[in-house]
């Protein structure tokens, strides 16, 4: 039977850990089991304990102290060490066959753009451990209200989609931070926007020599058709449930479930 896993991606501060906690809490409330796999060697404490934690293998703090490396260099060292010890990950995952594994990933984009760390882990999970995977990419709602920043975030999300080669769901987090009525109205156009129309706004704010570049970026985003975002309100069960339904669909979670045995406690007379 295939296993199901969700990679949670996005820049630092996008609300990845909050999203993981919201998904875990919601799944527990509906009787489904899930576990968080922490792949961030610099992670801080969260509401829910990590079932599997890369820091049990290697931590950013230890690498920085021992080798005198900076944060980014230490992060890359940690993941190269993990790639050389994937048997540890296999052993930790063990027999989690019928439960969701939610992989909370670091925010550094270079782990899949500059060096093939996350793509290698993805291929290993798929080929060696028989995982059905999808990637979720989070961007902060207050961040994308700025049209230029929207294109920046969309390109980052598209990089993850192309390089990881996984079913992909884009999410706008921290909707509660958008309080101004004007910004709330503006935000709606970014949930399913037309990039070509948004270039007019960008062109108004940039030097004319960048207009062709702006239009080229808009065309690129539009051609890949990845500009739709799902809104996330982490404290709203309906919002979390909607996103989980999308994840279930792309990972084919229902198809991976074994048929339930009839309840032999039910007597014929009770039916």
Swiss-Prot record:
Entry-linked Pfam families: ATP_bind_1 (PF03029)
GO molecular function: GTP binding; GTPase activity
Residue numbers binding GTP: 13-18, 173-176
Keywords linked to the UniProt accession: GTP-binding, Hydrolase, Nucleotide-binding
Keyword Isomerase assigned: no
Function statement: Small GTPase required for proper nuclear import of RNA polymerase II and III (RNAPII and RNAPIII). May act at an RNAP assembly step prior to nuclear import.
Protein name per the record: GPN-loop GTPase 3
Organism of this sequence: Kluyveromyces lactis (strain ATCC 8585 / CBS 2359 / DSM 70799 / NBRC 1267 / NRRL Y-1140 / WM37) (Yeast)
Lineage of the species this protein comes from: Eukaryota, Fungi, Dikarya, Ascomycota, Saccharomycotina
């Amino acid at each position: 039977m295939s296993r199901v896993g969700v990679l949670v991606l996005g820049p630092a501060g996008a609300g990845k850990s909050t999203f993981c906690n919201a998904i875990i809490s919601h799944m527990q409330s509906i009787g489904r089991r899930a576990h968080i796999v922490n792949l961030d060697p610099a992670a801080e404490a969260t509401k829910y304990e990590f079932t599997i934690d890369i820091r049990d293998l290697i931590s950013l703090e230890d690498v920085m102290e021992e080798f005198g490396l900076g944060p980014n260099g230490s992060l890359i060292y940690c993941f190269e060490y993990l790639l050389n010890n994937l048997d540890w990950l296999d052993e930790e995952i063990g027999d989690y066959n019928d439960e969701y594994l939610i992989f909370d990933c670091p925010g550094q984009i270079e782990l899949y753009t500059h060096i093939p760390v996350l793509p290698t882990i993805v291929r290993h999970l798929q080929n060696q451990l028989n995982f059905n995977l999808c990637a979720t990419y989070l961007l902060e709602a207050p961040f994308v209200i700025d049209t230029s920043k929207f294109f920046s975030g969309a390109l980052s999300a598209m990089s993850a989609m192309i390089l990881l080669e996984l079913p992909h769901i884009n999410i706008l987090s921290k909707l509660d931070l958008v309080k101004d009525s004007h910004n709330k109205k503006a935000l709606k156009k970014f949930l399913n926007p037309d990039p070509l129309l948004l270039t007019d706004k960008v062109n108004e704010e940039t030097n004319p020599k960048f207009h062709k570049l702006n239009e080229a970026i808009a065309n690129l985003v539009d051609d890949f058709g990845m500009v739709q975002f799902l809104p996330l309100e982490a404290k709203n069960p309906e919002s979390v449930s909607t996103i989980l339904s999308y994840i279930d669909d792309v990972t084919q979670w229902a198809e991976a479930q074994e048929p339930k045995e009839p309840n032999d406690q039910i007597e014929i007379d009770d039916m």
